[in-house]
Amino acid sequence: MTKYEYIWLDGYEPEANLRSKVKVTDGEPPEWSFDGSSTLQAEGGSSDCILIPVEQYENPTNEGSLVMCQVQTGEHETHPSNSRAAADAVVSDEWWFGFEQEYFLTNPDGTILGWEDGTPSRPQGEYYCAVGAANVKGREISEAHLDACLDAGIELTGTNAEVALGQWEYQCLGKGIKAGDDLWVSRYLLHKVAEEFGVSVNIHPKPKTGDWNGSGMHTNFSNEAMRTSGSEEMFTSMCEKLGAVHEEGISLYGSDNDMRLTGLHETQSIDQFSYGVSERSKY
């Protein structure tokens, strides 16, 4: 018998939450159902939704496997909350993605680690990639998460303390549609590891207003042509094409980004598109 920890995204908006439950069975993980009325994915009168396994990982926090799933309706049709199915139809395995996920660690009452007595007395600046108990909070969680992801077979390529106290980042490399699966499972493991330390994870774009950096997920991308014969002309053309759909893109990148994309704190204003070489104000 094998323990399979099924993971999926619920129907909450504007951002979905991660959900999970465990199945013990022989053989490979089968399709499984759940109560969609409890996850905003179905009405109570017809609440069955179907979990379709799409990727498996070693479970570093328990025996068995982690099973990333996409959601279908009870009639085996793509659920409206399932954006993976549409992505799978167009994403190529020769597309590489490098995700840089920033986050804050918080206490059960919502206060950020290191902020228990109010705003830190020193401004941001000394906390980035820092050492020392006065400059870093939560390193043990970041390192445990890194180990968990590597044990699961997820290609994390690094981690570091970020600009604000209690803020961290990790980098996740993936190829094709599996890159998205790896990212979601890495986030799931981050939440589970944080549970063990009695803290929570906050990926809101701007947990603290004022002169403090927010959190984003910078996304690096390349296809085969970019990696083998990329030129300045090619990259400029791609950036111009991205600029032409800037508003559409912003509408898909999650809520409250207007709080982070202000033109300050290593960001560009949300209503402007720009690009440059090694230019962090373009984020």
Regions found by a protein language model. Give the residues of each.
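Glycine-rich, acidic/polar active-site loops that bind/position phosphate-bearing ligands
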Residues: 1-283
